[in-house]
């Protein structure tokens, strides 16, 4: 299996911009034969959002994750994307695995580093 890593610098607070960049990366990776594209932590929201991260966080069953599923399906490539997840009145540093066919799989980071990550 060919795996592509997208080492992007996410634009803090601009999810639409970050999704557009991820879309182009998925197209490029798929055209190169990759079956999985991986992104860094918080690829959707970006680091540095500060207190705005709570407002930017998205649910695992929300529109942003569904958009990732559409990108995956259109390009025939699975995506592993870091994002700030809101659930149960809390924010999690999570990763979504989408393949365009099945329900997204969500992993919540459990070994948090430093005060910032523990405050999520």
Tell me what each language-model feature is.
Residues 60, 70, 86-120:
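Active-site catalytic loop in hydrolytic enzyme cores
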Residues 1-11, 94, 106-109:
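Active-site-proximal beta-strand elements of phosphoester/diester hydrolases
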Residues 9, 43, 84-85, 112:
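Catalytic metal-binding/acid-base residues of hydrolase active sites
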Residues 3, 18, 26-56, 72, ...:
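Active-site beta-strand/loop signature of hydrolases that rely on acidic residues for catalysis
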Residues 61-87:
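A short, hydrophobic beta-strand-centered structural micro-motif
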Residues 22-25, 68:
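Aromatic/hydrophobic pocket-lining residues that form π-stacking "cages" and hydrophobic walls in ligand
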